[in-house]
């Protein structure tokens, strides 16, 4: 079985034309069902609808969904920039981001957040696997850098 671009070659079959009696040999090709190149974005419409109803936290979530880069599921913005863009207080942004982090919806580093690719992403199965790995490592890299910085600080201090 040969797979190419989602198509699987299944062999050949002989068919008989009812009118002429001619035997025709045809190749049987089946298209493989794959997840393919997709954008999961149904949540955006739901959040938009809820945003119209109200809620400062929903405005922040909607802003994140509208501004996340679908190439890598990240958004570069400080909490102050998000507060200004959404017309919410800095404390509301901080609280909302903390809730999203605790719910494993986002992970954060200074000035950057990454949206969980299980919630929203664009791409195929391979890209989803890649983004899931990146999401898993996203916070870890920041923690390692912070630990290294603290280690350097304490070694310099002593």
Curated annotation (Swiss-Prot):
SMART domains: HTH_CRP. It holds the Pfam family RepL. Keywords: DNA replication, Plasmid. One of its GO terms (biological process) is DNA replication. One of its GO terms (molecular function) is DNA binding. InterPro entries: HTH_CRP, Plasmid_replication_RepL, WH-like_DNA-bd_sf, WH_DNA-bd_sf. The keyword Kinase does not apply. This is Replication and maintenance protein. It comes from Staphylococcus aureus.
